[in-house]
Amino acid sequence: MATVDRWLLPDGIEEVLPPEAARIEVARRQVLDLFQSWGYEFVVTPHIEYLESLLTGAGQDLDLRTFKVIDPQSGRQMGFRADITPQVARIDAHTLRREGPSRLCYAGSVLHAQPRALSSSRSPIQLGAELYGDASPSSDVEVISLMLAMLQLADVPDVHMDLGHVGIYRGLAQAAGLSGAVEQQLFDALQRKAIDEVISLTEGLPADLADMLRSLVDLCGSREVLGDARRRLAGAPTSVLLALDELLTIAERLSVRFPDLPLYFDLGELRGYHYHTGVVFAVFVPGVGQSIAQGGRYDDIGADFGRARPATGFSTDLKTLVTLGRAEVELPSGGIWMPDNTDAALWQTVCRLRSEGQRVVQALPGQPLAAAREADCDRQLIQQNGLWQVLPLAS
């Protein structure tokens, strides 16, 4: 390897330097404090686990995004976490085993073998919150409200939210008796809004079901879409009509809490179809080609850990949040330059200053006073009349 290559990082892997790293850390603390104020408890999950545990209950997408290695001690295959959500679901279902609702939050680096999009980071800092143990729309409204409060805290401008419900397509597909292969093909066509393919794949189905499945291509837009969907899907199974009712309930409650939030509905949006079971949502901003925060309901995942629990939650990339947010992050500025001196009284003074939250940087042997400014110090400790005093840094 050439010397120059030793400094190269893999595509999508970044290092974060000062002062950006400090901004990210301050934002992390602020967001976790926000989550705590809503009753969410912080958990820390392992960076690496046995693969069967890491991927339990997850879809193929997560498998493809997971870096895999062999554990030299056990010989078993392990994976670096690519998504913290399934790990937190396991904590709720298998470790905590609470009977009532449980609110958990997390923040940590994840690693992606494949990026989410062409220019996406493969080492995002995933931040999120999950609510377990309640299947009502109230839980969905709560986590969506918390997600929006997080974006308000970061002062991310011009956000709009997309809402969908995977139960609509799932209910229609089950009623049509689609095979697994056809269901997957139809799913792919709906994501691309490929109406010709959708028509071809639904030929031979009962006319009413074919029409309803085809309608999902263009059932998208503002809140009026829900009324249109009620008419066009009037003959759908009860589960589909209940899903529409849930979407309407959630939209009404969000409009009360966030009257200026633009809501967009897409009933053919099946983000996380093999993972989510109910409402799905995502936040977008102009100029960014993918969602900046996303989530939904995933009631079935706990069953893979021996205890099915209703669940809903969201996640975001903290680095993206800091990049897009306009909130002023207050970073420590200035500091006190401590001379290279072994005096006990100086050490006691420095300890007191640091305990008060002051930043004190010690000079190393041979360092000139000019080095103090390079260390962002604007004051210095000087001994006067036998006492160590904090004075402005000499020019």
Swiss-Prot record:
Instruction: Give compartment(s).
Output: Cytoplasm
**Biological process (GO) annotations?**
L-histidine biosynthetic process
Domain of life per record: Bacteria
GO CC annotation: cytoplasm
Query: Which keywords are on file for this protein?
Result: Amino-acid biosynthesis, Cytoplasm, Histidine biosynthesis
- Keyword Transferase tagged: no
Q: Which NCBIfam families match?
A: hisZ_biosyn_reg, PRK12292.1-1, PRK12292.1-4, PRK12421.1
Additional observations: This function is generally fulfilled by the C-terminal part of HisG, which is missing in some bacteria such as this one.
Q: What is this protein called?
A: ATP phosphoribosyltransferase regulatory subunit
Q: Which organism is it from?
A: Pseudomonas fluorescens (strain ATCC BAA-477 / NRRL B-23932 / Pf-5)
Q: Which gene encodes it?
A: hisZ
